[in-house]
Amino acid sequence: MTRRHDTTQSRSGRPNGGNRPGEGAPARYRAQPFTTSRRVVAIVIALVALTVVAAVALAAAFVPAGRGGSAAPAGGGAATATSGAAGSNPVSAAGSPAPAASSAPSVSVVSGGDTMGDRGVKAFIAAHGADAVFAGIAPVLRSADAAWVNLESPLTNIDDPYPGKDVHFRGDPRLAAGLANAGIDVVNMANNHAVDQGQAGLLDSIRRVEAAGVQVVGVGKDSAAARQPAIVHASNGATIGFLGWTDIIWPGFQAGAGPGVATAHPDMSLVEQAIRRLKHRVDYVVVCFHWGVEYTDTPIAEQVDEAHAAIDAGADLVIGHHPHVLQGAQIYKGHFIVYSLGDLVFDHYDLATGQTVLVHAVLSPHGVKVTLIPVYVSLNGIPAIVTGAPGRAILLHMQRLSAALGTRLTISGDRAYVRSRSR
């Protein structure tokens, strides 16, 4: 499926995407009494109805996705229902209920974890090229209407380490083309490494990534630019908006009159307002947060509160990064949250930080269908999809973490599944 980006404005500003379709509601049916003389006709109608219901149920077991409308990545059977809390509809910026995207076509979004281009990854690029970094996962990234990751390092040759900071990343600029060639449409850069090489390094990174054809969210030349969304147009006409925010910053990283990152803390109302505005411009809103505590597999209360607030404001999918390990998934009011995807392209020294998943989410006006695809990241930071016992171990770990959050993942074959209807 060919994807069209909203490219008429970069981090210096971006115009509106498509308008959201109007609200609709399913019809209600009520059984009517019938006489003995009409029972034969009624029985025939009932049998036909049962046949239609069975056909619909069978079709629902398949997850539509991909740039050409193909099924979700193969590996198992049907999804299962999960828990979720009921609640009111999201409200618009004016305080009225936001219109439901009841007639929007479904879209598929693939989300991946922390991605950087320094240390072991930089050495790998020097030896094998940037495209080889994503060779093990690119087919999944390309299968969706949109794919995105958290870009955890500036991609620049500028060497200007931010003063007072103990860890500085400076990723190989060639990774920008690698991102685009792998099928990644959007990167979030709202994180605690975006300004590792100063404001000049940040602006150079944005320029390089956008020049490669990848949109950037969560950073910009000032606070207004850092809060701008990226918009991806699916070939079926649906529009997907992306926003990125961070709770984890170094002093001076926050965008203001000058370049920096978009922050969710301490004023979450700015995030909620941005989501509500975007919800009236696109069919689906996907939000990324850089948050939580490193190397812990349980979300803190602030993560849960912010994720729920984002969905209450109109987000359809919430993706978390920063802990460098997996945290569980949760269904809230029919929408999917994963609190941390861990690392995707990141060298590491521990088994836990090598375990991750790609989240393949099919969003529709009626709910979400999610497939989790297990990935293992090598010690030098290169990801590959895993099957068999290693893949199942990752899925079982996610299943346990998600159960603690009240959401059940079903494992079938080399994939895990979750499905929920919007509320």
Where do the protein language model's features map onto the residues?
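Acidic, metal/ion-coordinating pockets
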Residues: T2-F34, R38-G69, G75-G77, A81-R423
